[in-house]
Structures are given as C-alpha cells and as structure tokens.
C-alpha cells in the first residue's frame, strides 16, 4: 500500500477530515414555499366529489334507519319481553272488578 504524501500547508488549511460525508456537513436546505397551482386545483375537484358521495351515503343511511325503526315496531320486544299494548286494557278490567267487589 502506498504511503500518503503529507504537506504541512495542506493539513493546516483543512480542519475537517476527508472521510466525513458532504451530506452530513452541509446545512439543511430551506423549506419550499411555493406550491403548484395545478395540483391544488386537482385536489379541490376530488374533494368536492368526495363531499358529494358522503352526502349521498348519509341520505341512504338515514333512509335505512327509518326502515329499520318501522320493522322493529312490528317485531316483538327484545329479550323475550312482550309489548305492553294489552296492559292498559287489563288495568281497566282490574279496576272494574275492584269496584264491583
């Protein structure tokens, strides 16, 4: 392996060793301020479409909820409980029986 030539003037002038990466020693680049107007306009169009589809989905969801509520009214109550539609009539019958006694 050949030996390096050492010059005193060259060593004194460079304080940083050569093996250090230029990327590490360089200052970070400033952030870009400009944005491209074409991409911004394209994003606006796509966001408008997304808003419209969300609105349509919301309407369908509300319609589905109303339909579900209507079907739930027709079905018997959950957990094996019965509806209390007949209970007011039975209360009246009990009151009449109590009066007749």
UniProtKB/Swiss-Prot annotation:
Residues where ADP-ribosylserine is found: 7, 25
Residues that bear N6-acetyllysine: 14, 27, 83
A Pfam family it matches: HMG14_17
One Gene Ontology MF term: chromatin binding
GO cellular component: chromatin; nucleus
Role according to the record: Binds to the inner side of the nucleosomal DNA thus altering the interaction between the DNA and the histone octamer. May be involved in the process which maintains transcribable genes in a unique chromatin conformation. Inhibits the phosphorylation of nucleosomal histones H3 and H2A by RPS6KA5/MSK1 and RPS6KA3/RSK2.
UniProt name for this protein: Non-histone chromosomal protein HMG-14
Gene name of the encoded protein: HMGN1
């Amino acid at each position: 392996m050949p030996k390096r030539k050492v010059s005193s003037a060259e060593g004194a002038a460079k304080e940083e060793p050569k093996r250090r990466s230029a990327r590490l020693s360089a200052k970070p680049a400033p952030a870009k301020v400009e944005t491209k107007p074409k991409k911004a306009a394209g994003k606006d169009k796509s966001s408008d479409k997304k808003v419209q589809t969300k609105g349509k989905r919301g309407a369908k969801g509300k319609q589905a909820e109303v339909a579900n509520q209507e079907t739930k009214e027709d079905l018997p109550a959950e957990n094996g409980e019965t509806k209390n539609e007949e209970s007011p009539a039975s209360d009246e019958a009990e009151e009449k029986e109590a009066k007749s006694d």
